[in-house]
């Protein structure tokens, strides 16, 4: 089941990201998410008309997705960037696609024209997943990320919403 996240989901969402993201190069983030930080993110996105979604299985958060404006400034008001993460047991179940589709529908309803993904160059599964969800690879930036003592490429992928 996919639903919009609430502050009550903050601790579980933070734990999911800490388990899935921190030990990998899926994201370049080095710091653990706290429940308070996630709570603030969920609230901030809701106030700005953006959204955070969770995927539930047996009442447990097994997936997370959110989106926000791609870059600051009014010239980017119709370009959104998302993040998505799934626990290993939720991969291949359709929940990831459902999260992406929920983000895309919400963003389009708010006037977004494009949805962007910044995928680690090492994350072949993530790039393939996004391609299956209608994203196309636009550019590969060499080395803007850094984690585990090495530079990491960033692949920009885009999905048209209109």
Where are the language model's segments positioned?
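Conserved catalytic-core motifs of GNAT/GCN5-like acyltransferases
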Residues: 66-69, 74, 116-119, 136-153
């Amino acid at each position: 089941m996919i639903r919009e996240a609430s502050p009550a989901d903050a601790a579980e969402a933070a734990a999911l990201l800490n388990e899935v993201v921190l030990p990998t190069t899926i994201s370049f983030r080095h710091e653990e998410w706290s429940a308070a930080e996630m709570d603030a993110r969920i609230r901030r996105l809701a106030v700005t008309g953006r959204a955070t979604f969770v995927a539930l299985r047996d009442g447990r958060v097994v997936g997370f997705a959110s989106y926000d404006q791609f870059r600051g400034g009014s010239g980017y008001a119709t370009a959104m960037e998302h993040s998505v993460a799934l626990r290993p047991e939720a991969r291949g179940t359709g929940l990831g696609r459902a999260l992406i589709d929920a983000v895309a529908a919400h963003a389009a309803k708010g006037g977004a024209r494009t949805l962007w993904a910044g995928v680690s160059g090492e994350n072949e599964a993530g790039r393939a997943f996004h391609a299956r969800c209608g994203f196309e690879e636009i550019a590969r930036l060499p080395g803007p990320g850094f984690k585990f003592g090495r530079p990491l490429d960033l692949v920009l992928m885009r999905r048209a919403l209109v």
